[in-house]
Amino acid sequence: MTLEGPFIYRLEYRDRCLQSVKDEQGCATKFAPPMTKVGFKLYIVCRLSVVLYVGVTNRPIRDRLRFGENPNGASGYHGYKWMDQPGPYELFIWNVKGGGDNQRMEIETLEAEIVYAVRAKIGQWPSGQTEIHFHESSNEDRRLSEEILATIYNC
């Protein structure tokens, strides 16, 4: 498995409704391939350089965000908890390439290692995190999670 990215966006929400998507320079934009394609992605939502949420999706990123914008609670899903905090948000996305049959498990392992590394760094789980998929990890998973967090904290 290799990761392509990060692709960095700034998001503005009002009442769980996406108002704007901006690139790193602050210019209005749209999500672009590979974020608009089906395929695994690791994504991290931050606010003021604080990690709020770490997630994995196989959907286009806009579809995944839209799902989190519209919680109904009836099926037990209450949407993204981080959307209850004021923005703007930074969205970091890595596109997953390769990985074969175990791609989901590999990216979920990395997701869990990043969440754990955030907890180790700040003493608390990310405030918007509501679930984690745990799998046995390797030294490479732990190294990569630290590298990803260094990228986020240095932006």
Indicate residue ranges for each PLM-predicted region.
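Boundary/linker segments flanking structured domains
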Residues: M1-F40, C46-L52, T57-C155
